[in-house]
Amino acid sequence: IGDGSRYDDEFVVEGWGDGIAFNDAGPYDALLVNDARVLGRSGVQDDPNSAAARELVRLLSNRGVRVNNGWGSGQASPLAEVIGTVRSAPLSDIVNEMLINSDNNTAEMLLKELGVVESGQGTRVAGLPVIGRTLAEWGVSLDGVRVLDGSGLDPNNAFTCRAMLSLIH
């Protein structure tokens, strides 16, 4: 079972529209492998959790491990046995990779993680106030600023030149 329940199931931002969603960003969730791409299939898969589970089953099968009942997406039982863990790279490395590669999925997941840390809710909506509050604490005027996603891809985002200069300085 691919369990991405740390975050909600908003895999793309509604405001992106068809030109951006599943092309420039998304789908993304708390469990994401290869940006939801599966070997042997074109494009990204609709459900990143299922795609990650499918990739794990493929890798295990290639190593002679038999997996019964295939793969899927859902929430793991609290009684499930942990068979492995992965430690995250340091946040500074993640942000560096995001900035160098213009990684929109990482930007969106970091926004949801802000929501988890601040409110216990892994949602874009829960993360957005953290952005506004932080900018205000840094002395950035929010007049004319509208942040609707983590990547900046939503066409209704707005960031003024004055806010950008204030942020840089």
Locate predicted features.
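A small/polar active-site loop signature that marks catalytic segments
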Residues: 37-169
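Periplasmic/cell-envelope proteins involved in peptidoglycan metabolism and beta-lactam response
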Residues: 1-36
